[in-house]
């Protein structure tokens, strides 16, 4: 019988156990598969569990270990992947009901890279339809129903990587892959009390994955610690001829590769907490800022550039999604989506003109210039992920989260990396989170700063008690 703490253990904790032979990947994988059978439906975590594949991969890496072939820290570690990454001979439905018979012939690049690193795929996690690129108003905009938060199943996981958040927070996988166009990694990380990184645009290949907004979409992990995020990111990052958007130069992600934290200058975004924020979230966020300050980070209140990032990101994402999903509009299948906002968005997109898009692209370039200048004065931005905890699953998200992520639109427009860090508990005992955001390809600074914070706090070790 495996100890209960393995379900919420980090890669750093599990890896030595597997390498030493004290724990086999098959044993660990069987345990996670049992938990998926027991808990997945409660949280709408998995769309397609892959028990046969998982046990085959686990047996293979155990055999490798007996032959003294150690693949690295992910050797034998069970994980889950958002159901928009192609997986050979496994259905990949992009969060929809009408694509459930779609079975790819090959793997996405990130799936191949994780397999090469020795990780074991437990299955494909549920997600918001088309990753939310067409917009959605309700948490149930998914083939599996709303993502239910393991901390309280009456509340949302966040999206669009809803199942990835539920799987890791519920102890159904050690880590999970998510994607983000605008908030889809950091949101479920925040609401589920996880550590998650949205890498710089172009750092990780999207080849073999659903790409709804080509110049916005990123791939990254949700995990139990910054160190785990670093390990996974190092395994999946890098140039890929299958994805022309990938950076060709290698980005250093090793510990200490970022800017020295003692010299970091952080911009603290002023927010109107009296208007929209929850006091418990503010208290937890203030304590996190104080912790960073005590560690030596210089923090100054500074507003973000006053630019129309929300409007520009919204228009361009909509147009790119229209191009990506046009076949489903043409054949009428878009009307089968659960949330009625998506087909209306596609129809509205058809009235946007070429000059509208050209203007938006020019404004986006200006926004990116503004942010390059901003990061000449500051190394990172510090802000809450949200000013409230996870909302009830039945609420209209436009009403329960009217202000969203304070820096989400800017980060989307500029391809900025961001790191979500657990910061305690708020209303109804739900997780509170904050984020640090850096300039493009300064992901290592975020990881180093996150390591510093998690060395001084234990919020990332908290997990829900499941029975």
Which stretches of residues belong to each language-model region?
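Short helix-loop capping/hinge segments that flank enzyme active sites or metal/cofactor-binding pockets
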Residues: 75-94, 260-270, 318-372, 420-431
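Glycine-rich, small-residue loops and helix-cap segments
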Residues: 21, 76, 116, 120, ...
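A short helix-breaking turn/cap at a secondary-structure junction
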Residues: 198-283, 456-467
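Acidic/His- and Gly-rich active-site-bordering loop/insert found
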Residues: 64, 68-140
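Glycine/threonine-rich flexible loop motifs
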Residues: 92-101, 278-279, 391-400
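An N-terminal boundary/leader segment
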Residues: 1-57, 294-296, 351, 462-467
């Amino acid at each position: 019988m495996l100890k209960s703490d393995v379900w919420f253990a980090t890669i750093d904790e599990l890896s030595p156990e597997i390498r030493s032979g004290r724990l086999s990947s098959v044993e660990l994988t069987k345990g996670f598969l049992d938990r998926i059978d027991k808990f997945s439906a409660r949280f709408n975590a998995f769309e397609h569990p892959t028990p046969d594949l998982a046990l085959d991969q686990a047996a293979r890496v155990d055999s490798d270990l007996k032959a003294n072939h150690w693949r690295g820290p992910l050797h034998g570690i069970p994980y889950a992947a958002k159901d928009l990454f192609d997986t050979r001979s496994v259905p990949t439905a992009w969060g929809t009901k009408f694509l459930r018979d779609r079975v790819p012939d090959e793997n996405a690049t990130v799936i191949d890279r994780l397999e090469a690193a020795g990780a074991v795929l437990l299955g494909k996690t549920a997600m918001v339809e088309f990753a939310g690129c067409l917009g959605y108003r309700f948490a149930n905009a998914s083939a599996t129903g709303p993502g239910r938060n393991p901390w309280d199943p009456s509340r949302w996981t966040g999206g669009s990587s809803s199942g990835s958040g539920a799987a890791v927070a519920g102890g159904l996988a050690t880590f999970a892959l998510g994607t983000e166009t605008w908030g889809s990694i950091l949101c479920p990380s925040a609401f589920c009390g996880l550590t998650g990184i949205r890498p710089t645009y172009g750092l990780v290949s999207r080849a073999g994955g659903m790409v709804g907004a080509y110049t916005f979409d990123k791939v990254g992990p949700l995990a139990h610690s910054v160190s785990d995020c670093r390990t996974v990111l190092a395994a999946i990052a890098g140039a890929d001829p299958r994805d022309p958007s990938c950076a060709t130069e290698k980005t250093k992600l090793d510990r200490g590769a970022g800017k020295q934290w003692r010299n970091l200058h952080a911009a603290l975004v002023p927010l109107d907490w009296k208007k929209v924020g929850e006091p418990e979230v503010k208290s937890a966020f203030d304590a996190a800022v104080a912790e960073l300050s005590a560690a030596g980070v210089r923090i100054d209140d500074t507003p973000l550039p006053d630019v129309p990032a929300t409007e520009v990101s919204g228009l361009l994402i909509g147009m790119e999604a229209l191009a990506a999903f046009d076949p489903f509009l043409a054949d009428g299948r878009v009307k089968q989506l659960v949330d009625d906002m998506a087909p209306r968005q596609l129809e509205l997109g058809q009235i946007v003109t070429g000059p509208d898009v050209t203007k938006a692209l020019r404004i986006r370039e200006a926004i990116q210039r503004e942010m390059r200048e901003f990061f000449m004065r500051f190394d990172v931005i510090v802000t809450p992920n949200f000013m409230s905890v996870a909302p009830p699953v039945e609420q209209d998200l436009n009403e329960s989260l009217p202000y969203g992520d304070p820096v989400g639109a800017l980060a989307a427009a500029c391809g900025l990396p961001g790191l979500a860090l657990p910061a305690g508990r708020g209303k109804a005992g739900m997780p509170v989170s904050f984020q640090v955001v850096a300039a493009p390809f300064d992901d290592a600074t975020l990881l180093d700063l996150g390591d510093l914070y998690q060395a001084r706090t234990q919020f990332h070790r908290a997990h829900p008690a499941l029975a």
